Structure formats: structure tokens, C-alpha cells
Design a protein with these regions (language model features):
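Short, well-ordered beta-strand elements
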Residues: 36-48, 66-71, 93-94, 144, ...
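Extracytoplasmic/periplasmic substrate-recognition and gating elements
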Residues: 61-62, 88, 165, 246, ...
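Extracytoplasmic/periplasmic solute-binding protein
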Residues: 139-140, 144-148, 153, 177-226, ...
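Glycine-centered hinge/linker elements that transmit conformational signals in sensory
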Residues: 182, 222-253
């Protein structure tokens, strides 16, 4: 994970330059992947709130003999389901996953099918996915999944609230804090947060680490080559506690489901949130709201290179699936990532896409803005829950939440994380 993490992070820069600058006409002839004969049903595990049904319907219309049995999970449920299934030795035929340390255990244990160069060519993966996006999904130099989306995460603000109070988008960290102070004085929650499960709070914590430690040290922390018990990280955790004390988050956020955070903006109770482009298709447009009222900004970490948090999302395949089920699952991923299929479904399926030449649809200003950033203005760093080994993610979450609750000081929390890092590294010697 450690050298892989750094390589993945470096590959993001290349992906940012290429992903939306390559036109669909540059794609080579589509591959002709094998189609199972007879009636075949394969299982697919995916996030319930993601628009998989759009592609399932298109796929099943194109291949009437093939059926997708979609089992729906929440974000945290699918993580648990994969852990349980891998321990039992019985996975789905295909499943949605993230990358980094969230996918590595299944790759290392032999559950995830390696997509060899031959398989990549057979299913058009090498032609239809931007090459650098494939690098993002690789683990130890090998590919174990087909990238579907790339997801930057950053600060969004509600324009109508900012306009009401004469506020402008903050471009520096100091400006951000002044905006928070003003909003708080007006009775508006500055930043909506759903702290249950810890990963939404992590987005803010990661932002603070990026600000105080800088990109180079942040990457070294992920690689376990720098100490979490350092002045820079302590400052980040101190800032987290300060924001809690000042009431910059909604009261009781530590127990709020992340899904309940965005409604605080929709109800004009909060003005900002750390989120990703998926809210455009999954929340804002379905609510018949104007997506132009929810504006993503580059989270002002005051660092060079300019970075925000982000990750890729992929489909993986079970090595022990029956041959026809495995072929059907691979064909499903190949179908979804065919440029013409991806482009005609982009409005409903969501963006930014990892497919060559696929542009965000009209009427999607959030995706369009992020696509523009990723052409070179903004680079990405992995979120902690993908960058660190999963054994250490829990230690990070526990320390972070303890600071929020006031049961640990920032100094003690950082020392606790580093103690876990040292113990983990000792087991790898």
C-alpha cells in the first residue's frame, strides 16, 4: 500500500490532464468481448443510492439472455458485506468497490480477479478507460477492477445563503474561517456534517492536515514515513476541536447519519458542506433544485500544488465465480465503459466518468466545474480511509472522534494514532 499509494497519487495528476481532454473519436475500435450463450444470471453488489439500474436496464436490453441480480447496500453495509463474504469464501460475482486499502485486502487474498493485459484487451478496458485512470485502480502494479468514476471531494456552498449575507467564496484558509464566523453570527450553521461512521468528519480533518502539513508531508503520512505525532498534525486536530467548540458544525453532528447533512443546506439551516459531485444527480436534481445554487470551490488549503481529496470507484470480479457468470459480469463492466454507452447514459449515470471522451451532460454545472478542475488546475489526494491500511483507519477515526467528543486532547489523539502506526509497522517487519 505504501509505495502504491504514492504511485496512485502521482497518477492522478496525469489523469487530471487527460481524462476530459481526450475526445471520443480518439478511442480505438471497440473490443468485441465474448457473450455467454444461454440464459445467465450473475450477482452484483452495489450501492443502493447509485444509479446502477440505468446501466442494468440498457445492458439487459442489449443482451436479453443476461440478467443482473443487484443486491443493494449502503456505503458502510457494502464494506461489511465484503469483509464477511471474503471471510466465508463466498463473494458476489461482481461488486462495486473503491480503491487503495479498501480494495487491497480482496486483491491480496485472491478474491478479486486480476485483469491481465489479455483480459483488458478482450473486454476493451485498455481502449475505453483513460490509461491513467487504470493506474489509479492498480494494486502492486496489477489491475483488479474496471474504473467507472473519479470523484473529487471538496467544499460546496449554497449560493442563495451567501448572497443573502453578502459573502463571497473563500479563496484562502483565513477567508474560510471569516465566512464561518459570519455565518455563525447570523444563526446559520457554517458547515453541515454527518459524523456517524466518522468518514464525513474525516473529510474536514484531511483538509486541515493538507493545510497545516502540506502535500509532501501529507503523502508521507499516508506512506507511514512521517509521524502523526508531529506539530503539523497536532495543529490540524487542534483546529478540528476549535471548529467544534466554536459551533462551526451542526450540534450533535457526531451521531448524525451522513445522509442527513445535505438536507441542512436544502432547508437553509447550513451554508457549506464537504461533499462530492454525486450530490448533483442523487440529491439536488431529484429534489428539483437548481444545481447552480450549490457551488463547489477548491478547498483553500493554501498549498502548492493545489489539491482536494478524491478517489476512483470501480467494479471488481470474483475469481471463483462460475465461468459464464464471470464472463457476463465482465461483459457488464465492458458494456458500461464503452464510450458510446457511457455518453448516452451520462445524464442519469453520473459523472465525472473514467471513460475516454465522456463529457458531463448539460445542466450539470457541478460535474462540469470539477471536470474543468481536473484538466490541470487541481490535483487529488486520497482520503485517509483509502490511503491508510484499514487496520489504521479505525485508529484514526477513534482518535478523531475522541477529539470531537473531548475525551482526548489533540496531542493525545495524535500520539495514539502514531502508536497504532508503530505497532502496525512492527508486524510487517
Amino acid at each position: 500500500m505504501k509505495p502504491t499509494c504514492l504511485r496512485l497519487l502521482r497518477s492522478i495528476a496525469a489523469f487530471a490532464t487527460l481524462a476530459w481532454s481526450v475526445c471520443s473519436g480518439a478511442a480505438q475500435e471497440a473490443a468485441k468481448p465474448p457473450v455467454p450463450s444461454g440464459n445467465v444470471t450473475f450477482s452484483f453488489w452495489g450501492i443502493a443510492s447509485s444509479p446502477w439500474q440505468v446501466m442494468i436496464n440498457d445492458f439487459q436490453k442489449t443482451y436479453p439472455n443476461l440478467k443482473v441480480k443487484w443486491t443493494k447496500y449502503s456505503v458502510d453495509e457494502i464494506k461489511q458485506a465484503l469483509r464477511v463474504a471474503s471471510a466465508a469464501g463466498k463473494m458476489g460475482d461482481a461488486w462495486f468497490n473503491w480503491g487503495g486499502s479498501l480494495a487491497a485486502p480482496y486483491d491480496d487474498a485472491g478474491h478479486s480477479l486480476e485483469l491481465t493485459p489479455q483480459l483488458q484487451a478482450e473486454y476493451g478496458v485498455d481502449k475505453n478507460i483513460v490509461p491513467a485512470a487504470l493506474e489509479l485502480a492498480k494494486h502492486n502494479g496489477k489491475l483488479y477492477g474496471v474504473p467507472i468514476w473519479v470523484r473529487p471531494m471538496t467544499i460546496f456552498y449554497k449560493k442563495s445563503i451567501f448572497d443573502k449575507y453578502g459573502l463571497t467564496a473563500p479563496k484562502t484558509f483565513d477567508e474560510l474561517e471569516k465566512v464561518c464566523e459570519t455565518l455563525k453570527s447570523k444563526g446559520i450553521i457554517p458547515v453541515a456534517n454527518g459524523g456517524k461512521f466518522s468518514w464525513m468528519t474525516m473529510r474536514t480533518t484531511d483538509f486541515f492536515v493538507e493545510h497545516f502539513a502540506g502535500p509532501a508531508m501529507h503523502d508521507k503520512l499516508f506512506a507511514l514515513e512521517a509521524s502523526y505525532n508531529s506539530p503539523e498534525v497536532i495543529k490540524a486536530f487542534t483546529k478540528l476541536k476549535e471548529w467544534v467548540t466554536k459551533g462551526y458544525f451542526n450540534e450533535g453532528f457526531i451521531s448524525l447519519d451522513p445522509a442527513q447533512a445535505l438536507p441542512l443546506l436544502q432547508q437553509d439551516k447550513a451554508a457549506m458542506i464537504f461533499q462530492g459531485p454525486w450530490i448533483e444527480d442523487q440529491n439536488i436534481i431529484p429534489a428539483k433544485e437548481d444545481p447552480n445554487n450549490y457551488v463547489p470551490i477548491i478547498a483553500p488549503a493554501d498549498q502548492t500544488p493545489v489539491r482536494v481529496s478524491g478517489f476512483q470507484e470501480q467494479v471488481q470480479f470474483w475469481t471463483k465465480a462460475k465461468p459464464d457468470e464471470q464472463k457476463a459480469a465482465l461483459l457488464f463492466a465492458s458494456f458500461m465503459t464503452t464510450p458510446e454507452v457511457a455518453q448516452r447514459n451520462i445524464a442519469a449515470f453520473g459523472s465525472p466518468s473514467a471513460v475516454v471522451g465522456v463529457q458531463p451532460p448539460e445542466g450539470h454545472p457541478i460535474a462540469a466545474q470539477m471536470a474543468k478542475w481536473l484538466q490541470g488546475e487541481v490535483k487529488l489526494y486520497l482520503p485517509t480511509d483509502q490511503a491508510l491500511p484499514q487496520e489504521l483507519v479505525n485508529a484514526f477515526f477513534q482518535a478523531q472522534d475522541s477529539v470531537v467528543l473531548g475525551t482526548l486532547t489533540p496531542e493525545a489523539a495524535c500520539a495514539q494514532i502514531q502508536k497504532a502506526v508503530d505497532a502496525f509497522k512492527a508486524t510487517k517487519k
